[in-house]
A protein has these predicted regions:
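Substrate-binding/active-site clefts of carbohydrate-active enzymes
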Residues: 1-155, 170-196, 202-204, 217
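Active-site-proximal helices and loops of the catalytic beta/alpha 8
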Residues: 13-16, 30, 41, 63-77, ...
Length: 298
């Protein structure tokens, strides 16, 4: 439910339950670098870890969580924890509206250099993705991240999707971010999943799966720690090579999703803008026929 306001989400909750979904994934709720309704990608250009933007306030989030809970639905939030919004015409420089706490210390930032080789783990985890990269390994930055997530937990959030999780290093690579973060969360049993798309190394995927569920379009060696999708916001909305499903019909995507549900434990259905396919009876039927342990996220 990306870029939906509170009323739209609340109105959709009863139908989501009727369709057999177990959780609703809400788009980023962090303060954005610019006000007003913008392109979809602006939701991934936050100023830091302050909660509340043009789509949802703290009160909205709390109300949504309470109403969803009354329908036995969990609420998940899409979180941007490793970068901020960029300055106009200078992709790797933080926007002037970025939180002053972050701007004040150069140690809070990655080197201003983009990833050049996505097959090179060192390159991926130490450099930027065409946005200003945060040094999430710095204890003060990690403290801000933990406080942000715990504030959402206090509002009733039961799960988090971590955007671009692939760019955050693992213990075998010398970084303890993931175990440290999980230990810092005030509630156990949260559903945590991270975007680790196009990663070919099964060893890397397996290590991520020790800490978070791995979000992707194909199964890794730990299927019970995978969250699979037939389409994501990136694959539908992106204009570059990432937009590999934008020419597929909603019906094609739905059929692919139903096939995933029949065979895999955790699945995510992306709701296209102004598209009602998620209400199709075929999805409800697929959920009813799925394994009982399956977790279905809209």
């Amino acid at each position: 439910m990306q870029n939906w306001d509170a009323n739209a989400i609340i109105q959709a909750i009863p139908k989501a339950k009727e369709q057999g979904f177990d959780a609703c994934l809400i788009g980023p709720v962090q303060k954005l670098k610019e006000d007003g309704y913008k392109e979809w990608w602006m939701s991934y250009q936050p100023t830091g870890f302050q909660i509340g933007n043009i789509y949802l306030s703290k009160t909205d989030i709390q109300n949504i969580c309470q109403i969803a809970h009354s329908y036995l639905l969990d609420t998940h939030i899409d979180c941007i924890i490793n970068h901020t919004g960029s300055k106009e015409n200078d992709a790797l420089t933080p926007h002037p509206n970025v939180d002053p706490r972050l701007l004040k210390n150069p140690e809070y930032w990655k080197e201003k250099k983009n990833v050049s080789n996505w097959e090179d783990r060192k390159d991926v985890i130490t450099h930027c993705m065409n946005v200003p990269g945060l040094n999430v390994y710095h204890p003060e930055v990690q403290k801000m991240i933990s406080e942000f997530l715990n504030e959402l937990v206090d509002l009733g959030v039961m799960g988090f999707r971590f955007d671009a999780a692939k760019s955050i290093g693992l213990p075998s690579e010398g970084y303890t971010f993931w175990p440290d973060l999980i230990y810092s969360l005030k509630k156990w049993g949260l559903f945590l999943y991270g975007e680790v798309i196009f990663e070919k190394s099964q060893n890397v995927l397996a290590e991520y799966a020790k800490y978070i569920n791995v979000l992707g379009s194909y199964v890794n060696e730990n299927p019970n720690r995978s969250v699979l999708f037939s389409e994501s916001h990136d694959s539908f909305l992106s204009e570059d090579a990432l937009g590999y499903t934008k020419n597929k019909s909603s019906e094609e995507i739905m059929k692919e999703y139903c096939a995933l549900v029949r065979n895999h434990e955790n699945t995510l259905f992306y709701i296209r803008p102004f598209d009602e396919t998620w209400k199709n009876p075929q999805i409800k039927e697929a959920h009813e026929n799925a394994l009982k342990r399956v977790r279905k996220i809209a």
